């Protein structure tokens, strides 16, 4: 997600999602825990303990949240690393996953100690996932552009592995929107209202219970 007209204090994916989680009603942002690379170097044992306390026994996803990645000023979606389905019952797996995400920063020559690692509860029962632009990315035409995959994996679109495409006219009557996409459109409208812009790029997942 990179809202491009929001408050300048949002410098990362973690900052943006933390703000949105407190505001969003129609959709859901999974539980969040984030920390900086410097925090990890200073006391990774405490971070591991806090992560387990917060998410146990659920599985988690460990995600990159570099300064400038999916922020107000720029987007680097898919540039770094995300690791899914990490058990909170095995400390070593958690530690290794965080180390991999941090290593990806180094490999991309971004060693900012204020880069973050974002941990969220792993969404379950996903049936559709993808990335949606709230206007066409090339010229801003009034269409929702939805790149999607009907898969339980939540990152195969951002990785470029699978992508189907549908466009929905922003001003069309709601009754003609395919049922599959109605809830997503309602959530997008709420997010646009929260950030006061209709130029957004948002990763999404839809569950069997139609939770977005």
Regions found by a protein language model. Name each.
Residues 1-212:
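Nucleotide/phosphate-binding sheet-loop regions of phosphoryl- and nucleotidyl-transfer enzymes
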């Amino acid at each position: 997600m990179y809202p491009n007209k929001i408050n300048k204090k949002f410098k990362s994916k973690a900052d943006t999602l933390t703000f949105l989680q407190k505001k969003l009603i129609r959709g859901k942002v999974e539980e969040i825990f984030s920390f900086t690379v410097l925090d990890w170097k200073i006391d990774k044992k405490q971070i591991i303990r806090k992560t387990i306390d917060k998410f146990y026994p659920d599985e988690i996803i460990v995600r990159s949240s570099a300064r400038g990645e999916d922020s107000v000023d720029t987007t680097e979606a898919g540039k770094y690393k995300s690791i899914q389905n990490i058990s909170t019952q095995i400390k070593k797996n958690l530690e290794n996953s965080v180390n991999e995400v941090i290593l990806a920063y180094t490999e991309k020559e971004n060693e900012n100690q204020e880069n973050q690692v974002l941990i969220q509860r792993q969404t379950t029962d996903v049936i559709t996932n993808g990335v949606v632009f709230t206007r066409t990315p090339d010229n801003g035409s009034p269409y929702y552009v939805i790149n999607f995959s009907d898969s339980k994996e939540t990152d195969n679109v951002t990785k470029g592995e699978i992508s189907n495409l549908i466009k929905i006219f922003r001003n069309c009557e709601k009754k003609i929107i395919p049922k599959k996409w109605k809830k997503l459109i309602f959530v997008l409208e709420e997010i646009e209202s929260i950030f006061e812009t209709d130029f957004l790029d948002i990763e999404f997942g839809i569950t069997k219970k139609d939770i977005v």
